[in-house]
Amino acid sequence: MNNLKLFHASDLHFGAGYFDYILAFQDKFDIFCFSGDFLYKDSAHEKEQIALWLKSFKKPVFVCSGNHDMPPSWLNSINSIYSDGTIKTIKGIKFGCVPYLCDDLLEFAECDILLTHVPPAKTSTSISKNDKDHGDIELARLIKNNLLKAKIILCGHIHEPKSNMDILNGVKIYNSASSGAKEPFYQEIEL
């Protein structure tokens, strides 16, 4: 696409060592993307620390809310990041930040890259190792019917999916959910 290097992680759940670990990559990546579930529990302390951390990035940061971030007003009030509902073009690539439980995914139909917490249903990124599908049926339907322009979906939610990457109707899906390991799981995506 445009010679950009993207960092993608999800489901950090306020992992103690994750924040400094990720910040150390600032010079290695052009854009940082996080697909929700920043919080472990709904506490003012966690929200404050995450907000400070997100504000400390020197590169563009895109985020979407996850089920543990509800209500997401705290996340969406951080001025220096692109959050829920945002559509922003950088170097000709249109990013869209889909809120958790989005009412109308078609608002993001023209985006090249979508950040969404829940992966499309019936993909190896949405099916857990115990064979339960936790994916978004509507998102999968829109992709299958070519109603979204997106070429890349950045998601999480499923901590141990069958696979962290899949392709549905030509759309690359990256599930970068961390599973509580000492170091956060992340994916490096070259555009």
Q: PLM ranges: what are they?
A:
Residues 7-11, 32-37, 61-67, 82-84, ...:
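Active-site neighborhood of phospho(di)ester-bond hydrolases with catalytic His/Asp-centered motifs
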